[in-house]
């Protein structure tokens, strides 16, 4: 059957369009996540991440040792290197090469962070980014000028989903309570972590997850180890938190 030149041209156009679409899709997948999350975080390549923070450098496993995964925001980034040093020769301590942000971002990224495993222990926290207030441009603002990123009810529901997935790995799970918010912290309300820790406590009790109460320790030592008007800690403060994290991990690794 003879095909008209017009129909032949249409077939060529359709084939070219489909091929181009496939190539673009493959290219985007190969490139990985490049755009910011709706939760205000933006994944980096490993090279970019490692240039920003020494804690983001990937570690080589010692085969005979158990593998531990730390998941958390900048507070956990601050104690990662100390935990690695304290567990040297006893565990391979890994963490995602990024700030893990809020529970919403965690749901987007958890599969990537878990990777192929296996994990003996997963020590994690979410909270400080959930309870912050942002304006339409993503800037930290007072509560009356913006919206809370993840309201506490959504936070609690997100935690249940995150814990359920982590438990599927077979790892022992430890939740670290969210550390104190001092007066004057940008985009956050002093003491609001208490409401979020209460919600997290309900989830962890129901799902039988161990709790590392970093909040209680940090609150008792707040004037000494935490920066003023800032959720972050001094180097000595991060070292103290690392000691608590290390002990909680060892308690789960010990038969």
Question: Where is each model-derived feature located?
Answer:
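Active-site metal-binding loops of divalent metal-dependent hydrolases
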Residues: 73-74, 128
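Short beta->alpha connector loops
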Residues: 74-76, 100
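N-terminal post-signal-peptidase region of extra-cytosolic proteins
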Residues: 53-56, 101-110
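N-terminal secretory targeting modules
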Residues: 1-69, 76-77, 81-92, 115-118, ...
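Active-site beta-strand/loop signature of hydrolases that rely on acidic residues for catalysis
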Residues: 71-72, 122
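Alpha-helical cap/lid subdomain in secreted, periplasmic
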Residues: 34, 62, 86-92, 105-255
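Short beta->alpha junction loops
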Residues: 95-101
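Short hydrophobic segments within beta-strands
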Residues: 70-71, 176
């Amino acid at each position: 059957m003879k095909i008209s030149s017009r129909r032949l041209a249409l077939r060529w156009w359709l084939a070219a369009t489909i091929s181009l679409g496939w190539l673009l899709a493959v290219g985007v997948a190969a490139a990985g996540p490049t755009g910011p999350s709706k939760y205000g975080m933006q994944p980096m390549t490993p090279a970019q991440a490692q240039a920003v923070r020494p804690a983001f450098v990937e570690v080589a496993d010692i085969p005979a040792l158990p593998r531990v995964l730390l998941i958390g925001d900048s507070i956990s980034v601050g104690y990662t290197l100390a935990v690695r040093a304290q567990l040297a020769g006893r565990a391979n301590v890994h963490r995602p090469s990024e700030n893990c942000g809020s529970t919403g971002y965690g749901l987007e990224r958890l599969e990537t962070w878990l990777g192929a495993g296996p994990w003996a222990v997963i020590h994690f926290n979410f909270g400080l980014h959930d309870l912050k207030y942002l304006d339409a441009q993503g800037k930290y603002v007072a509560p009356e000028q913006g919206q809370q990123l993840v309201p506490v009810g959504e936070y609690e529901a997100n935690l249940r989903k995150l814990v359920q997935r982590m438990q599927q790995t077979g790892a022992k799970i430890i939740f670290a309570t969210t550390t104190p918010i001092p007066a004057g912290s940008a985009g956050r309300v002093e003491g609001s972590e208490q409401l979020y820790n209460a919600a997290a406590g309900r989830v962890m009790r129901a799902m039988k997850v161990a709790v590392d109460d970093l909040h209680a320790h940090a609150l008792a030592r707040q004037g000494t180890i935490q920066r003023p008007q800032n959720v972050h800690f001094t180097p000595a403060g991060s070292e103290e938190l690392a000691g608590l994290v290390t002990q909680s991990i060892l308690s789960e690794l010990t038969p």
